[in-house]
């Protein structure tokens, strides 16, 4: 008897529950933060960054730690990290004299020396000054096997969105009418000297909600 009564009561409870409409705003009061480029989201970001920066700078060890980190970063005796391409070792170097950095290369024999000589390919501080831009290095992709043509990416102030241009190492200049992608969260990769894969904003539906390329052409 009791088992039947409890079963009937449970069944009545199931049918008596009324479905409630789903309100996404009530479920997540911060849903507007998903608009990564929205004015409200960016304003909130700047506000929270200011609060966090003030808290960090108020710490007793902040100034001392900052000075020590800068000393390490600007130490010219640190071993440069390199990428080998053909006969050359490539490195991107930043220090107090070159805050935006130098993209440079050298030979293995020279690299083994205590004070190697470097061939500077791009001075990012000079480039930014010449173009009146706050360029931050985004990387290089050079075409094998001779590695003479490279796709150089830079961003404004270190943003995720980058500008990509084709660079001629032999001439030490960007290629006139060469491969170029305007500022976007994009990707450009070599196929051959005349062809590249492109992932960028091709119009409606070509980008993810976070602003990255959904389509490669």
Features from the language model and the residues they span:
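Beta-propeller folds
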Residues: 6, 15-217
